[in-house]
């Protein structure tokens, strides 16, 4: 049976019975997505949703949606899990975990408030004029936010959409061909909750191909007030080329991440954390560990313990399906490393691959839970492989060691320093790829105080004409 993906415009599922369709092949299954028309583009670009919600109403709506996702019997959740397994090759455990995380994010009311508080300085600034310095300041939405989503990490799309919702922007969401399910399921759950809610009505979800005629998609891109682009270099270049010149583009492009193991006393705890950071999303995420740098004299013990923990993850979070080409790349990498006489171990049925090699000797990286481990003496042997704008996450075990290295790592380009085993949890208050995204989704408006309002440095009213007439400007210079 062919899976049909709906077209959602303004929170309404469109009748696409007369639309042409594009066939996507996912995990050897066919998915049909409607090809957007001129009429669709006109509906999207002309849509204007009045959002007078305050932050409390926004968070409460998201919480209500999250409670639906929390129910293991929610039909939308069940369908989503089946789609991830059938079409994206996720193991049932991975798919269930993804749905669990959607519910966790939506139901974490305190975290949603704190995201706004930390990024924008106050959770009230999106609702009220706040006194700041000699002004009153308010953060208004940019307007129409276009989200060009990637398919490797479904939760990145959820995060992108929630950031726009928290800042009261409309969402025009272009799904990835690899994952046309997540954004559609999320928007559909909004419809299930309240079809007439302003947040629901501000959601439009569709797909178009970058490699075909983009005349109609370009009309949609031209209406953007802000663009959020996720994906590889080609996706980021496409977004840059096709976005209006005047709009801000938040670029979440390709990154790499590493783990540092600093002579741990608890070898097992260190291995558990590193195994998690290798296995989560099968290394498809920017934050996934690909290289491990070990400092200390128990590398062999750690290597053996890490293989045990990778085998445990094979059971508790099984790897997703691999294509023929992916299996071939995995086997080729293994043979290349064996030929180079590196220490190599792999799990049954290509569950994982661990290779010990000297620092700086990087072979192919097929991902799919394959990692290189390098023995180094100190941090100076690691910093050459930390690249500005490339290295995202550095996970460190034991955690206490991070305080020794954070200044050095940051100065060499690392964007995020975490405890091993926490790579998929972006802590509230932290930056994302070197930025605070919500700040770039709003427009700050300043209402400045009048001339009679004295400043800290000048305790008289500001009478500029008088200063010029009497040539007394310098009298007031502090």
Swiss-Prot record:
Disulfide bonds: none annotated. GO terms for molecular function: acyl-CoA dehydrogenase activity; long-chain-fatty-acyl-CoA reductase activity. It catalyses: a long-chain fatty aldehyde + NADP(+) + CoA = a long-chain fatty acyl-CoA + NADPH + H(+). Keywords: Luminescence, NADP, Oxidoreductase. Signal peptide: none annotated. InterPro entries: Ald_DH/histidinol_DH, Ald_DH_C, Ald_DH_N, CoA_reduct_LuxC. GO terms for biological process: bioluminescence. CDD domains: ALDH_Acyl-CoA-Red_LuxC. Pathway: Lipid metabolism; fatty acid reduction for biolumincescence. Pfam families: LuxC. Its EC number is 1.2.1.50. It comes from the Bacteria. The keyword NADP applies. Belongs to the LuxC family. LuxC is the fatty acid reductase enzyme responsible for synthesis of the aldehyde substrate for the luminescent reaction catalyzed by luciferase. This is Long-chain acyl-protein thioester reductase 1. It comes from Photobacterium leiognathi. The gene is luxC.
């Amino acid at each position: 049976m062919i899976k049909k993906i709906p077209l959602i415009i303004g929170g309404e599922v469109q009748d696409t019975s007369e639309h042409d369709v594009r066939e996507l092949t996912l995990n050897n299954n066919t998915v049909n997505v409607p090809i957007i028309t001129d009429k669709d583009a006109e509906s999207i670009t002309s849509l204007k949703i009045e959002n007078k919600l305050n932050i409390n109403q926004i968070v409460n709506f998201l919480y209500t949606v999250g409670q639906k996702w929390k129910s293991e019997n929610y039909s939308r959740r069940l369908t989503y899990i089946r789609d991830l397994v059938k079409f994206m090759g996720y193991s049932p455990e991975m798919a269930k975990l993804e749905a669990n995380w959607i519910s966790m994010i939506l139901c974490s009311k305190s975290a949603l408030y704190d995201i706004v508080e930390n990024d924008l300085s106050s959770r009230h600034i999106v609702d009220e004029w706040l006194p700041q310095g000699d002004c009153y300041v308010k953060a208004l939405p940019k307007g129409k936010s276009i989200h060009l989503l990637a398919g490797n990490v479904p939760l990145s799309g959820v995060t992108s959409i929630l950031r726009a919702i928290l800042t009261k922007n409309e969402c025009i969401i272009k799904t990835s061909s690899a994952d046309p399910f997540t954004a559609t399921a999320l928007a559909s759950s909004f419809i299930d909750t309240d079809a007439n809610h302003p947040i629901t009505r501000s959601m439009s979800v569709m797909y178009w191909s970058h490699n075909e005629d983009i005349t109609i998609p370009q009309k949609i891109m031209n209406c953007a007030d802000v663009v959020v682009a996720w994906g590889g270099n080609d996706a980021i270049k496409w977004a840059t080329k096709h976005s209006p010149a005047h709009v801000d583009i938040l670029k979440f492009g390709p990154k790499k991440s590493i783990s540092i193991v600093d002579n741990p006393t608890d070898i097992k705890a260190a291995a558990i954390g590193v195994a998690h950071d290798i296995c989560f999303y099968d290394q498809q995420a920017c934050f996934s560990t690909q290289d491990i740098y070990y400092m200390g004299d128990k590398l062999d013990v750690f290597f053996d313990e890490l293989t045990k923990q990778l085998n445990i993850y094979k059971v508790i979070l099984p790897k997703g399906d691999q294509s023929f080409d992916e299996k071939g790349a995995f086997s080729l990498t293994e043979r290349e490393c064996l030929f180079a006489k590196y220490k190599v171990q792999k799990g049954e049925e290509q569950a994982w691959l661990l290779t010990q090699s000297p620092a700086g000797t990087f072979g192919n990286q097929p991902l799919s839970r394959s990692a290189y481990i390098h023995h180094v003496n100190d941090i100076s042997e690691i910093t050459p492989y930390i690249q500005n704008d490339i290295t995202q996450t550095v996970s460190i075990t034991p955690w206490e060691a991070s305080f020794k290295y954070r200044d050095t790592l940051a100065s060499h380009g690392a964007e995020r320093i975490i405890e091993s085993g926490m790579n998929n949890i972006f802590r509230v208050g932290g930056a994302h790829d070197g930025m605070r995204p919500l700040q770039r989704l709003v427009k700050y408006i300043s209402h400045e105080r009048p001339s009679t309002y004295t400043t800290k440095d000048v305790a008289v009213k500001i009478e500029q004409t008088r200063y010029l007439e009497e040539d007394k400007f310098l009298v007031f210079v502090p």
